[in-house]
Amino acid sequence: MPFEAVIGLEVHVQLNTKTKIFCSCSTSFGESPNSNTCPVCLGLPGALPVLNKEVVKKAIQLGTAIEANINQYSIFARKNYFYPDLPKAYQISQFEVPIVSDGKLEIDTKEGAKIVRIERAHMEEDAGKNIHEGSYSLVDLNRACTPLLEIVSKPDMRNSEEAIAYLKKLHAIVRFIGISDANMQEGNFRCDANVSIRPKGDEKLYTRVEIKNLNSFRFIAKAIEYEIERQSAAWENGRYNEEVVQETRLFDTHKGITLSMRNKEESADYRYFKDPDLYPVFIDEKLLKEAQKINELPSAKKIRYMKDFNLKEDDANLLVSDPLLAQYFESMLHLGVKAKTSVTWLCVELLGRLKAEITLENCGVSTHMLGALAKRIDEGKISGKSAKDVLDKLLEEQGGDVDALIEQMGLSQVNDTEAIVKVIEEVLKNNADKVLEYKSGKDKLFGFFVGQAMKNLKGANPSVVNAILKEKLG
C-alpha cells in the first residue's frame, strides 16, 4: 500500500537581543555556568518579569517576512510543567493569542513551487540546560529566559525534502532580516518534527509522533525518513495501533533511529492560563510601522541578482543561502568587480578552499581583499592561475595586502604593448621557418609562438600576447 507522510514543524528561533526576554541579564553564549542569571531567570519568589521591547520588534519583523497577521493585542500565558532546567516550574509563553498568526512560506519542490502555511509564531522564554555526566546531572541556567520565537507550521509537508526546503528558507529569512544568528551548533535554531503517515489519497490525520530538539538539517532529514519507514512498516505488519502512539521521541544520531522518550502531552496537560505578572502586549501603529521595515528578503534578492547581473539560478540560490555570502558579493560589486568574476572567486575559489574548521567568518580574507584580487584579474594585472596562488597565500597568512603580495610573488602581468610587440617580433624573427610553416596551414604552431613569447616576457597578459601574435602572423 502506498503511503504519504504528513509533516508539521515547530521551529524555535533564539532572538539575537543583547538581554533576555524578561530581565536585563546578558544572552551571551559560552559564559561560565549560571553566571548570566538573576532572581527573575532563577525563578526566585517575588521577582517580577519585564518584557524586552526588542523581542516584540523582532517578532513583528518575522511576521512581516512570512506575510502573516500581526496581532496588535496579544497575551502571555504560563505553560505549567516540571523539569530541572525550568526553575519556576512553568514557562512564560503565548497560547490563545500569539503575536503572529496565519503566515506562509513558498518553497521549491521537484513538482514546482509549494505554499507551506504557518499557523502561528509566538514569543516565549527558553529553559536552562541539563548536563548529564556519569551518574549525576548538572543544571546551567544561563540560557533560561533567553528570548525565543516558536514558529509552528501547518502539517503541509509530505516528505523530508519539503521539510528541509522549508527549514532552509526559514533559516535564511531570520538571518537576512537580522533577528537571529540561527547558529544551529549553539542551539539558536532548533526544530521539533511532528510526523504521521496515511494511505495515499486519504485525508484523515492519523497518530502523530513528535521528534524533539533536532539541530542539523542532515539529522532532521534522517529522523523524518526513519520515522516514516518505522510507521509504514508497523502499518503493513498490522501493528500500527500498538507501535505508533502519540509520544515524544529522540533521534539517536549514531544509530540513525528514533527512540521513545515519553508520552506526548496535550495542551490541556500544561494547564495554560494568563500570566498575572505581565500586562497584555499592545502594539501601537508607530511601533508596528517602525518594526515592519525589514531588510531585503532572500527571495527578492535572488530575483534581483538574476535580473540585474544575469546570474544563473544555482549561483543566485547559493549567494542568498547566507547573508555573509551576499555581503561579500555585493561588496565586490561596489569595488568594481564584474558579477561573473565575483561569483567565480567567491563561490568557487574561496568557498572551495574552506575546510571544516575554516569558515567565511574566520578565514581572514575580507571582502576588500577578495574584491581587490578579483579586480586585478578583470584589469588584466594578474592571470587567473596566478591569482589562485595569491588566494592560497592570503588564506595561509590570514589576510594581507593583495597588491604587495602580487609584487612579492612576482606575479604581475606585463601589459606594456610596446614591450610585448618587441619580444614577439624577436620570437618570429628567430623562428622564421616555423612562421612559414604556420602560414602554409600548420595552425597548431600558434601555441608554440605563444609559449615562446610568454617564456621571454615572464608574466605577460596572455590575451594581449594572443591578439598581437594574430595581428603579426596575419
Curated annotation (Swiss-Prot):
Catalytic activity: L-glutamyl-tRNA(Gln) + L-glutamine + ATP + H2O = L-glutaminyl-tRNA(Gln) + L-glutamate + ADP + phosphate + H(+); L-aspartyl-tRNA(Asn) + L-glutamine + ATP + H2O = L-asparaginyl-tRNA(Asn) + L-glutamate + ADP + phosphate + 2 H(+)
GO molecular function terms attached to this record: asparaginyl-tRNA synthase (glutamine-hydrolyzing) activity; ATP binding; glutaminyl-tRNA synthase (glutamine-hydrolyzing) activity
Keywords, comma-separated and alphabetical: ATP-binding, Ligase, Nucleotide-binding, Protein biosynthesis
Organism superkingdom: Bacteria
Record carries keyword Oxidoreductase: no
Annotated GO biological process: glutaminyl-tRNAGln biosynthesis via transamidation; translation
Record EC number: 6.3.5.-
One Pfam family in the UniProt entry: GatB_Yqey
SUPFAM superfamilies recorded: GatB/YqeY motif (SSF89095), Glutamine synthetase/guanido kinase (SSF55931)
NCBIfam families listed in its UniProt record: gatB (TIGR00133), PRK05477.1-2 (NF004012), PRK05477.1-4 (NF004014)
Family: Belongs to the GatB/GatE family. GatB subfamily.
Quaternary structure (record): Heterotrimer of A, B and C subunits.
Function: Allows the formation of correctly charged Asn-tRNA(Asn) or Gln-tRNA(Gln) through the transamidation of misacylated Asp-tRNA(Asn) or Glu-tRNA(Gln) in organisms which lack either or both of asparaginyl-tRNA or glutaminyl-tRNA synthetases. The reaction takes place in the presence of glutamine and ATP through an activated phospho-Asp-tRNA(Asn) or phospho-Glu-tRNA(Gln).
Protein name, as recorded: Aspartyl/glutamyl-tRNA(Asn/Gln) amidotransferase subunit B
Organism expressing this protein natively: Helicobacter pylori (strain ATCC 700392 / 26695) (Campylobacter pylori)
Phylogenetic placement of the source organism: Bacteria, Pseudomonadati, Campylobacterota, Epsilonproteobacteria, Campylobacterales
Gene it is expressed from: gatB
